[in-house]
Amino acid sequence: MVERLSPLEPDFHPGSHGNFEHGVDVILTETRPGSIVQLAAWPGEEKKLIAAIRAVTGLALPDGAGGGISSGGKSVFGFAPGKFTVADDAEGLAEAFAKAVGPAIGTVTDLSHGRTVIRIAGPKAEWVLAKFFAIDFALPAFPVGSGRSTAHHDVFAQIHRSGTDQFDIHVFRSFARSFWKALCHASEEVGYEVQ
Amino acid sequence: MLITCPYCGPRDVIEFTYQGDGNRERPEPASQNFEAWNAYVYDRLNPAGDHNEIWQHSGGCRSHLRVVRNTLTHEISSVAFARGDHGPRRKMEGKS
Ligand SMILES: [Zn+2]
């Protein structure tokens, strides 16, 4: 298998940065999932697609807009009506979904090499992200497991809350380094560690 | 100005793209009715008040939306999926 190169590499500097004298308040990392796919159901076929997601990943999507769940290295969340992003630490999701989602149900798009997933975790993760995105990061409005589609200066972002203080941000690979640098600058104030 | 996307909830107008007057009726593509085409391209109601508009949540879920906006106050009195009801909706406090 060809080794995948990170687009962040020239600006990815492990270690502590910014105002970390009193400790680091966020940890930045790249999650590098083996597969990322986008699934879209034709209108009226959403339930069949959700059943296919369950059959392939074992994940049961909760009801509601932006609902999602993570377990066992896999995650899924809704990002638009009838549309879902699925990520897996392992490779091969697109092939599995191509078998499970027929053309009468919807579409499968392999984005494994097209997206970069940046994780921000820690007590100030909400604080730092609130500098970028005009959405409500409070837990009742943005529960663990769910996803949000939004944008920062035309850099489209899908944000998946993978923990109480942890967010996985899916950005276009070609914008990832620029977004990463901005995220590092925004994290200097609170002290950050790149892992 | 905030637009409450039926899927994403309230978002800043910067996430949306205006797609034009929602009152227009596009003639059939093969239509030779030039008056109808002229009306589709040029005629606008230009009301001082509630106006039917098409917006896209281009910086979010990318749904096309049917929005009623007051041209005097910018108050938005209704937002719906342009293609009719589909998919789950976000639960709004005090609103359905
Ligand atoms: Zn939306």
PLM feature spans:
Chain A
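Basic, glycine/lysine-rich polyanion-binding surfaces/domains
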Residues: 1-195
